[in-house]
Amino acid sequence: MGEVAGGAAPGPPRSGLVSIIIGAEDEDFENELEANPEDQNSQFQSLEQVKRRPAHLMALLQHVALQFEPGPLLCCLHADMLSSLGPKEAKKAFLDFYHSFLEKTAVLRVPVPPSVAFELDRTRPDLISEDVQRRFIQEVVQSQQAAVTRQLEDFRSKRLMGMTPWEQELSLLEPWIGKDRGNYEARERHVAERLLSHLEEMQHTISTDEEKSAAVVTAISLYMRHLGVRTKSGDKKSGRNFFRKKVMGNRRSDEPPKTKKGLSSILDPARWNRGEPSAPDCRHLKVEVDEKPGPADRKGSLGISSRDRTVGTPGQDNPGVSLHPLSVDSLDSREPGVDTPQEPGDTPPQGPTSLEPLAPPESTEDNGETESPEPGDDGEPGRSGLEQEPEEPPGWRELVPSDTLLGLPKNQVKRQEVISELLVTEAAHVRMLRVLHDLFYQPMAEGGFFPLEELQNIFPSLDELIEVHSLFLDRLMKRRQESGYLIEEIGDVLLARFDGAEGSWFQKISSRFCSRQSFALEQLKAKQRKEPRFCAFVQEAESRPRCRRLQLKDMIPTEMQRLTKYPLLLQSIGQNTEEPAERAKVELAAECCREILHHVNQAVRDMEDLLRLKDYQRRLDLTHLRQSNDPMLSEFKNLDITKKKLVHEGPLTWRLTKDKAVEVHVLLLDDLLLLLQRQDEGCCSSHTSRTLTPTPDGKTMLRPVLRLTSAMTREVATDHKAFYVIFTWDQEAQIYELVAQTSSERKSWCALITETAGSLKVPAPASRPKPRPSPSSTREPLLSSSENGTGGTEAAPADARTERILNDLLPFCRPGPEGQLAATALQKVLSLKQILLSTEEDSGAGPPRDGDGVPGGGAPGPTHTQEVEENLLSLEVVIKQLEELEEEFCRLRPFLSQLGEILSPNLAAPERSAQTGLS
């Protein structure tokens, strides 16, 4: 059946094969099937055979892209491309390979072996050594072999049935196999170019995910260029997340078939915030070329320049095609065009001398302008040089004289590499902040998507951060230039940034920006759900080349990520610094960075807590509290927990009776303990809360909102997960039995409740308690106006103020005779004194002396011990009630003062009339 398909399959006949109609009576039928030259001479027996034949590989890639998951095959091809690079280029290329195939968020992610995934999760990819990188790539490729083999088998079987693409084009190439190698390779590249162009036109049919389709075409285009195939629009897309095209043309034009020289500059260090010294050289070459206007007119014949010129400006990107505009690739998309007109000839390109004059026509003034903004942010003069000048850690070696480099000790070499990494990553961070500002913040403001005040809350202090980081980068660049690329002293530059007033200002603006991350992401996510126009704007902006295939949600946390890197980099610099004074400066700067990071982390936690409290406040149902007649709950009828500080939260079990328990979610605030019922039992983090007011067995009602000023905790002896929380009001005390999930959680809850309650105690009777910092004054204004609620209002009328103050005074009303608490406490003290005196009398006259042989030695018996413990516990409860009363008195004084100011005019008139009557 395979022979029938091979000889009589529909479609164009394959030249080089004799079409023979074989009848069923032919006795040699089986033998001819076994000797089928189609199987013996197939170019698709293995990936090693097909990956060096561009046209055949294009047919295979199109089949796989439309029928299978193309990630494994593309991963193997790109790994083969990396194997041809030198050590330095391979280390830089591994970053792009990681972000394209290994990263968890990669569009073309492939299954990664567990051992490799574990190492990648715990180590930054740019810090992995070259040997480990090669080992990782080998293991990843080996894990993809099974999938690639299945895809090849499927392609071969479908080809025998005439169901694979481009059979007619491939059949035209087969007569040339083994004849004229140069002519055959030129024809193969020419056919592959046509097939690639067709694949780019049908890009939308590869996948329903537009981003994935573009990534597949980008990866294919890159490997085709590696094989010497001229690419057009694919070059502009390929800068999205793969390899560098900028310098590649100048080098690959020397010898297109030789992959090592061509790929030495394929990877774009600026894509992943890395630089290399060759980048300024390429820029310098382009500037020299741009000064020659003569050959610029020639590129019109290539049919490429007009498209490349239009993609350099940000405002002209086509929102419908996410990957097409990429000004960085304009140079490369033209440079292969110089190679390939010579490739169809019988002889391959001769070398750099024959092609050097052809390189300048491809770099014109227009394209020079479109290419330079990409690495250095569009439309910003001077940024391109700043973006390209920093080198990746291995790159600084090329700027230092070889004799000087050989004489450096190992720790000095390590120090210079870390300093170079600090400079490079700082330049990349500045670029990312400018992308946030230019592509998102400004267009959002101009497009009216958010009010200006709310937009400033989403991107707070962005301009200040750009200014601060740019200044720091300029100082580093200046120091590197002054020192001849071998920086000896950097401590003063670091201290000028992270210490003193500059450090305080940096801490303030970075805290403001980082603390809004959660809020900003929620606001942007909600806006995208509600407004399709905004969603389209974000997607179009994210498709810009400057975004490096990162989404907006990935760019917002960049400042926080940068702050975490500073202490590590500075610590490494200090460890490799020998001079004591310089080392002390660097270590001091590292300590300042750690303090800044600690402050920012705390600000982030506080803001996240505030956002959670706002969510709880929105879900909180206070209806039952408002309907309650309990005077202790009256102050909580309009409870606003967003004014509080969240100390701890978590699920607990509230044991109401021996046989009844309720699952609650407990919020420990700075002065309150809230017991909230979860309605959605399946999810603790997104539930709707409702306050509980159970009254089991007709006893005194247990309140779900409790003040911590009179709180105590005790562990339950019979249950290692349970604990008591004891609250006292007037002459009553209520005990809440709560059960944690583990014993460690119980200890944590007890410690936090005790610590929080202890911080509320008044230190002295005459001293006024220090007011707690209000979150509304420190955190609330940072949110949008819609989240903040109503702003400040004018002073209320006297009647309203009076009623408000009376409502505030209501919680201080206490039933029962005055002085009862003090009398009870005094009685408890006298009882304890009497017990202790009676114990001493029973044990003999006078206090016991050391070495007395009297049995008991003055120690009380079991009955006396139990009685003393009971009296001490009851005395402790009364003392806590007295402390609470003392604190309430201190809080009562300002209310009485305000009430006196309101009532004094009304009381003054009757007093004056009475005095007049007496006179």
Curated annotation (Swiss-Prot):
InterPro entries per the UniProt record, alphabetical: DBL_dom_sf, DH_dom, p115RhoGEF_RGS, PH-like_dom_sf, PH_16, PH_domain, RGS-like_dom, RGS_sf
GO molecular function, one term: G protein-coupled receptor binding
Function: Seems to play a role in the regulation of RhoA GTPase by guanine nucleotide-binding alpha-12 (GNA12) and alpha-13 (GNA13) subunits. Acts as a GTPase-activating protein (GAP) for GNA12 and GNA13, and as guanine nucleotide exchange factor (GEF) for RhoA GTPase. Activated G alpha 13/GNA13 stimulates the RhoGEF activity through interaction with the RGS-like domain. This GEF activity is inhibited by binding to activated GNA12. Mediates angiotensin-2-induced RhoA activation.
Modified residues (Phosphothreonine): 693
Superkingdom of the source species: Eukaryota
Gene coding for it: Arhgef1
Protein name: Rho guanine nucleotide exchange factor 1
Compartments it resides in: Cytoplasm; Membrane
Modification(s) after translation: Phosphorylated by PKCA. Angiotensin-2 induced Tyr-736 phosphorylation is mediated by JAK2.
Gene3D superfamilies: Dbl homology (DH) domain, Pleckstrin-homology domain (PH domain)/Phosphotyrosine-binding domain (PTB), Regulator of G-protein Signalling 4, domain 2
Organism lineage string: Eukaryota, Metazoa, Chordata, Craniata, Vertebrata
Subunit structure: Interacts with RHOA, GNA12 and GNA13. Homooligomerizes through the coiled coil region. Interacts with CTNNAL1. May interact with CCPG1.
Keywords: Coiled coil, Cytoplasm, GTPase activation, Guanine-nucleotide releasing factor, Membrane, Phosphoprotein
Chain positions found as Phosphoserine: 372, 904
Biased composition (Acidic residues): 363-379
